């Protein structure tokens, strides 16, 4: 899940990190999950529930965008999904169920596709004292982008643990190459070379059938261990492999 902050003249969008919460948390805007799986068999669409536990009234703007769209971009490239309702009143203690539906059936059938479910909660009123010296008012909006994976019916069902086991690691010079031979997107959790945690950065999510390269400063490691994030947003059991 991506959470960001962007600033425009007279209107400030602040990070939702403090108020967007995972399932089970007691306060904030609670999300049904931290990622969304859209199975190809869902011909009538899927639902996703968002709960307002902030005590404040919001307008919730919801849409699906290409994954990696620039935060705050007013008109990102179209994605083949609609969300209903696209804009809704979001009162305290409301549990709003969104309906997400595929509108074009031209996505690849031999691998997953990834998009972003963009959720922007805009307060119905500015907070007291939010007016700046110039007279502009600050509007504090919470925005989250969750990964939405389209999973074609043609794919063989593979558990998250099996996807983790399928990953292939090898050393080439000072780089660790990680290959994903599956038709699924795989998000790495924690990777360790010997006992040292590897800094992954943008290489954390592997596209289907792709390879990423991670720089490994220091001595050549003898082994690697890893886990991945499953469909529920939780880490799988750790796997390990010799690099000899």
PLM segments and residue spans:
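Beta-sheet-dominated interaction scaffolds and their linkers
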Residues: 21-53, 157-171, 203
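Terminal connector regions
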Residues: 103-155, 221-244
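Intrinsically disordered, low-complexity Pro/Gly/Ser/Thr-rich segments with frequent PxxP/GP/PP motifs
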Residues: 73-106, 196-223
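Intrinsically disordered, low-complexity segments enriched in serine, threonine, and glycine
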Residues: 165-244
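Short acidic, flexible loop segments centered on an aromatic residue
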Residues: 53-75, 181-198
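Bacterial N-terminal signal peptides
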Residues: 6-15
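Buried hydrophobic-core signal for structured, non-transmembrane domains
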Residues: 46-52, 100, 115-120, 175-180
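Positively charged n-region of N-terminal signal peptides that target proteins for export
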Residues: 1-4
């Amino acid at each position: 899940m991506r959470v960001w902050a962007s600033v425009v003249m007279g209107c400030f969008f602040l990070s939702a990190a403090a108020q967007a919460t995972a399932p089970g948390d007691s306060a904030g805007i609670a999300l049904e999950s931290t990622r969304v799986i859209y199975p190809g068999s869902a011909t009538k669409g899927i639902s996703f529930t968002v709960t307002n536990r902030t005590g404040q009234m919001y307008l919730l703007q919801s849409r699906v965008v290409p994954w990696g769209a620039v935060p705050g971009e007013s008109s990102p490239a179209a994605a083949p999904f609609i969300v209903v309702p696209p804009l809704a009143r979001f009162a305290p203690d409301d549990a709003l169920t969104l309906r997400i539906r595929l509108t074009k059936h031209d996505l690849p059938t031999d691998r997953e596709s990834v998009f972003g479910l963009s959720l922007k909660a805009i307060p119905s009123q500015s907070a007291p004292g939010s007016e700046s010296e110039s007279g502009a008012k600050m509007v504090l909006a919470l925005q989250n982008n969750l990964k939405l994976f389209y999973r074609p019916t043609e794919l063989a069902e593979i558990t998250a643990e099996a996807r983790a086991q399928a990953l292939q690691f090898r050393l080439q010079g000072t780089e660790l190459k990680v290959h994903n031979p599956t038709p699924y997107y795989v998000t790495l959790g924690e990777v360790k070379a010997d006992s040292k945690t590897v800094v992954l950065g943008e290489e954390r999510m592997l596209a289907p059938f792709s390879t990423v390269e991670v720089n490994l400063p220091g001595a050549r490691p003898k082994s690697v261990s890893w886990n991945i994030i499953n469909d529920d947003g939780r880490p799988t059991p750790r796997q390990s492999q010799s690099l000899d």
